[in-house]
């Protein structure tokens, strides 16, 4: 029986960046009724057993970091609370950090209040990216529904976590060229700085929230269709504009925002992949942020459109 898993590229990178981020992915889902805890436990256990990285400890070996598959119980993962203050319980749960050497790499909480359940989930970003998070939630929901209907648990999709899978859909010659890309190494003369300082004794986690109603997203999507911009362009432009104005960034200076690109587009369609990180870096560099948000969106759209046309889009900065 397999006892270890190889640490892939982004597993190690997220571990290294631990001095500047807490490495956690957090999500919550509010239900109209109450979640049946017994059914959820069966669903969580089935998903966890399908993906061994979820019950593994990261071992930072100086030559070959790896995951050690560990024993665990459902109590290591799930907590259930009945409360009159769901917001405080949620904040207490979400403000945790799962150590990389913990025996489980995600935790879930069911917070019951006034006949409704709030499902909070926190995962180690070393194990998976945003696209894989969708798969994770889908598989939990699928298993829960099957058990609720009295049906057997499904065989869940899983497979390789190997970083090299992102080249599997390319012809051999392109595969060689893509592996040799060094475009993430630049010779720009501007001063490059990292946005975060090292951890200090006075640091503490703080989660900033902004709730968007459906109508706001619908309006943004309609505006994107009308102008030819993507929703991602608009969200990125809003981030750049807000960051620049908040930090009093010099209006005449260029700035670069690093974004993540899903590289599953390059994976062979028939390939079976597990929960992992299959992303690349996209450097969105604009000469300056706009005098209006509309101007900034236009500048961002020009960059992203140009990058998407490149032969190895997403593979230059991994």
What are these model-derived regions, one by one?
Residues 64-66, 158-161, 257-261:
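Short alpha-helical linear motifs
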Residues 1-10, 14-15, 127, 131-222:
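Non-catalytic, low-complexity flexible loops and terminal extensions
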Residues 32-52, 121-138, 209-250:
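Acyl activation and transfer enzymes in specialized metabolism, enriched
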Residues 1-61, 84-106, 245-318:
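Acyl-thioester-dependent acyl-group transfer interface
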Residues 41-131, 135-148:
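Acyl-thioester-dependent condensation/acyltransferase catalytic cores
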Residues 39, 131-135, 156, 164-168, ...:
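Amphipathic alpha-helical recognition patches that constitute DNA-binding helices
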Residues 112-116, 142-152, 226-232, 242-254:
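Secondary-structure boundary elements
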Residues 21-44, 67-89, 98, 124-128, ...:
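Acyl-group handling in specialized metabolite and lipid biosynthesis
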